[in-house]
Amino acid sequence: MTTKEKLSLLRNEMKANGLDAFVVFNADPHMSEYFTPYWEERKWITSFDSSAGYVFITQDKAVLWTDGRYLVQAKNQLTGTGVDFYIEGTKDAPESDQWLLDELHQGAKVGCNALCTPHNTWVLLSQTLKRKDITIVDAPLIEKIWKKRPKDERQTIYVRPEKYTGESATNKIAALREIMQKKGVTHFLVTALDDVAWVTNLRGNDIVFNPVFLAYLSITPEKATLFAELKQCDDSVKAYLKQHHIELKDYHDFFKEISHINGEKILLSPDANQSIFNTVQPKNTVYTEVSPIQLLKAVKNETELEGFRKAMIKDGVALTNFFCWLDKNIGKVELTEYSLGKILDKFRAEQEGFLGNSFAMIVGYLG
């Protein structure tokens, strides 16, 4: 299916739902920097596969905003697709929210998948659109037309031993409860995957280059509940959670569970997805501020610092081995940036404790 055909299907859905415009952000429900192919809605609808960019679609226009790193890529991938683009921050690029406001009539309606939209972005867009009484509504339309969507694959969750973390999950949860008490909140809903992994000392491989797993975490003064795919948790993980007094519930039960919260004071990051706010805001008082987990994990304990030191030494050994190999082989075999990157990966993988790279190698044009 071509991009133009996909846009035509989407516009039919927009018309059927009374929408004058539709916004697709590059995000998953946890606002992860990297995410699984299942959530690549912007990539699917536009055929633009960079890591940055979002698209605004009306009945007669589709415009994508991205940054200067992807100028050449945008030209190559979007030309002739029916999707125009702007490079943010350049003199010819309008502010995206203002562009949408100018394109729409008084009282128009804009659709967006709230599950993949951070709350702060939703609020800012709503404030701009309010100038013309334009409303933004939750409308997950992509799922209606993306028929061959990839499966949302999950991998086994595992425990990160305390000899690496330097602090137990029990102590971390206790510290968060102290913060909650000082702030006067009764519930803390943790939505960022790295935050969930840090608090629980659990890791996974659901997202390439990121040792995390898809999950939410709810903390109250009496209870901590991890919402994760049950089949990802073997008996050892279940026993570990029980040891640290963390209840395990299915990932897909999260919204049903939080819909029962009533009359409470809830702490949420402004980066949490708008669907969570839509669920809890009507019946509770919601406080939005930077997750206290971000602040806690920014201060490394001595065990973590020692881990950094050891990692740097191991990486230094890998680099030394790589340079020795290069010195012996340069001029004897054909070498490209890509092939050198694979060789460097091999030397790093030889080091004890290697789990994988933190991002894909960045290779120059034509490798």
Model feature map: region roles:
Residues T3-L7, T90, A114-W122, G166-T170, ...:
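Generic detection of long, well-ordered alpha-helical segments
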Residues L124-K151, N273-G307:
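Terminal amphipathic helices with adjacent charged low-complexity linkers/tails
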Residues L296-G367:
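Long, K/E/R/D-enriched contiguous segments that form extended
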